[in-house]
């Protein structure tokens, strides 16, 4: 058994470092899975629930709080990465442009990146920036898994309807994109997303 074959111990996650510039990233070794999404889509809450560590990724009622790339080590070789939230209107355009350049460089150049989790509020899916991020990742041949978060905010039928609509919208991208319902409140989809992450971590370099 290789060091990547067993499922990671997500509850062992520990804050590693933060980077505001590409040259501040930790060594491009091992395996990383990154989380990205619009401000207040539930990205930090998803990371906290997946690891079972309350407050691991800081949550805030003020969108746009995460302005750096934050790294969390699961072990010596595997990391979860919290990318800056986007789409917050009060962030100056210069800051937004710097964010776009940093994230684009990360997705394009980070060789240890195994997959990208795109977090979307199920009530407001596939906004323009969501689609831009998906386009970036597809162009760089990065596997994508979409979390439609806050599914508890909709009825079961409404959530399934939105799931189907988003599935239809992304079908042109083929098998590179998968998606699911998720709720940090009632833990809907927790086992499913963990299975996806573990599969990515076990994939060949």
Curated annotation (Swiss-Prot):
Pfam families in the record: MMR_HSR1
Keyword tags: Cell cycle, Cell division, GTP-binding, Magnesium, Metal-binding, Nucleotide-binding, Septation
Domain called EngB-type G: residue spans: 29-203
SUPFAM superfamilies, sorted: P-loop containing nucleoside triphosphate hydrolases
Disulfide bonds: none
Molecular function via GO: GTP binding; metal ion binding
InterPro entries (alphabetical): G_ENGB_dom, GTP-bd, GTP-bd_ribosome_bio_YsxC, P-loop_NTPase
Single GO cellular component term: cytosol
Cofactor (UniProt): Mg(2+)
Gene3D superfamilies (alphabetical): P-loop containing nucleotide triphosphate hydrolases (3.40.50.300)
Biological process per Gene Ontology, one example term: division septum assembly
Chain residues that bind Mg(2+): 44, 66
Binding, GTP: 37-44, 64-68, 82-85, 149-152, 182-184
Stated role: Necessary for normal cell division and for the maintenance of normal septation.
PANTHER family hit by this protein: ENGB-TYPE G DOMAIN-CONTAINING PROTEIN, MSS1/TRME-RELATED GTP-BINDING PROTEIN
HAMAP family, A to Z: GTPase_EngB (MF_00321)
Family to which the UniProt record says this protein belongs: Belongs to the TRAFAC class TrmE-Era-EngA-EngB-Septin-like GTPase superfamily. EngB GTPase family.
Protein name: Probable GTP-binding protein EngB
Native source organism of the sequence: Coxiella burnetii (strain Dugway 5J108-111)
Source organism phylogeny: Bacteria, Pseudomonadati, Pseudomonadota, Gammaproteobacteria, Legionellales
């Amino acid at each position: 058994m290789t060091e990547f074959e067993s499922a990671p111990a997500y509850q062992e996650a520990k804050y590693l470092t933060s980077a505001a510039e590409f040259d501040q990233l930790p060594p491009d070794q091992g395996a990383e899975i990154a989380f990205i999404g619009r401000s207040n889509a539930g990205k930090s809450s998803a990371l906290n629930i997946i690891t079972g560590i309350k407050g691991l990724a800081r949550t805030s009622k003020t969108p746009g709080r995460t302005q750096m790339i934050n790294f969390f080590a699961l072990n010596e070789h595997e990391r979860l990465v919290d990318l800056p939230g986007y789409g917050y209107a009060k962030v100056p355009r210069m800051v937004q442009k710097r964010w776009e350049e940093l994230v684009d460089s990360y997705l394009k150049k980070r060789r240890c990146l195994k997959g990208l989790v795109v977090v979307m509020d199920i009530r407001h899916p596939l906004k323009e920036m969501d689609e831009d991020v998906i386009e970036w990742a597809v162009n760089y041949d990065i596997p994508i898994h979409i979390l439609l978060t806050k599914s508890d905010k909709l009825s079961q039928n409404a959530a399934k309807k939105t799931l189907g609509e988003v599935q239809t919208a992304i079908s042109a991208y083929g098998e590179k994109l998968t998606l699911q319902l998720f709720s940090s409140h009632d833990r809907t989809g927790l086992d499913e997303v963990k299975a996806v992450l573990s599969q990515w971590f076990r994939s060949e370099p």
